[in-house]
């Protein structure tokens, strides 16, 4: 069985999407070469949320399932929603109305032995709380948004510790230095 992956890009100030689920803030910024290709090869299914689906569907009606990784990935896309009855039909997208654990089980089964990638901050948060996220990858983008959807919004919750999946000390902090882009 595949793993449950939380794979996300995040601004320096901790946002994974701008207001209204906007993602255009990432244009012109690139991830390490090979990272997307590795993800595309590993992923067998995607599980997202309704608010993100609706925001993307408003920009690219009928083409949400073709958007992951710039169209390089294809496979089953699941959208968890409280209201599947008013969801717009789209090829390659299945709407689920169940609890998060069951949605993960359904999507993992559809992934056919490959990994399931979470495309929703809220669903990912719930999966973290349930202890069912196997791996978390964050791409820290060199931009500050000021507002939007936070990476892990869980007021009053307990801290969640992660071990780095790299050589060396898995608890070692990552030190990054930046300067304003005008200094290039």
Task: Identify the role of each PLM range.
Residues 1-184:
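Enzymes that bind and transform nitrogen-containing heteroaromatic metabolites
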């Amino acid at each position: 069985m595949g793993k449950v992956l939380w794979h996300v890009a995040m601004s320096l100030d901790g946002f994974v999407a701008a207001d209204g689920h906007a993602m255009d803030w990432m244009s012109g910024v690139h991830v390490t070469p090979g990272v997307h290709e590795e993800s595309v090869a590993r992923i067998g299914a995607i599980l997202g949320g309704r608010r993100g689906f609706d925001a993307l569907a408003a920009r690219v009606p009928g083409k949400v399932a073709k958007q992951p990784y710039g169209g390089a990935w294809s496979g089953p896309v699941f959208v968890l929603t409280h209201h599947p009855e008013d969801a717009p039909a789209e090829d390659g997208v299945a709407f689920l109305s169940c609890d998060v654990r069951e949605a993960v089980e359904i999507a993992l089964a559809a992934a056919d032995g490959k990994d399931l990638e979470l495309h929703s901050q809220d669903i990912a948060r719930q999966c973290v709380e349930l202890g069912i996220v196997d791996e978390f990858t964050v791409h820290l983008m060199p931009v500050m948004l000021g507002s939007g959807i936070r990476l892990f919004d869980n007021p009053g919750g307990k801290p969640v510790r992660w071990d780095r999946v790299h050589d060396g000390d898995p608890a070692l902090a990552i030190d990054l230095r930046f300067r304003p882009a005008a200094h290039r």
